[in-house]
């Protein structure tokens, strides 16, 4: 497991000090972005980390302020998991973010539609 963010502990919005973790297990990679938005994504990209991930936990519940095109191009996820409550008052996930996720070609799972999402990696490295 590698901590890739936050880069800076100074931000106008606490979402942009979220812990961002990259986990690699048996050849499969996962990126957990907390509530990170585009500001933090840009800092992480500038730091030069390898961000490729088979599974991306979408930043900030799929907010339009997160998961920018440039960030998603680096991550190249096969699966996107959006942790979001049904009927939330913030109208998340955002329609722009959903469009960006669809543009990656990734399979999208939403907890408001699917409930809990479980990803497993077996001994052969199959996700």
Give residue spans per PLM region.
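Core dinuclear metal-dependent hydrolase active-site scaffold
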Residues: 1-55, 113-127
């Amino acid at each position: 497991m590698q901590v890739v963010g936050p880069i800076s502990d100074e931000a106008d919005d606490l979402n942009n000090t979220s812990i961002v973790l990259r986990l690699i297990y048996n050849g499969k990679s996962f990126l957990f972005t907390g509530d990170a938005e585009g500001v933090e994504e840009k800092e992480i990209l500038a730091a030069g980390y390898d961000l490729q991930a088979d599974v991306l936990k979408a930043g900030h519940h799929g907010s339009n302020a997160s998961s920018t095109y440039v960030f998603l191009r680096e991550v190249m996820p096969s699966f996107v998991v959006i942790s979001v409550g049904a009927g939330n008052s913030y109208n998340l996930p955002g329609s722009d973010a959903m469009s960006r996720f669809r543009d990656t070609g990734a399979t999208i799972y939403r907890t408001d539609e699917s409930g809990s999402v479980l990803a497993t990696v077996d001994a052969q490295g199959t996700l």
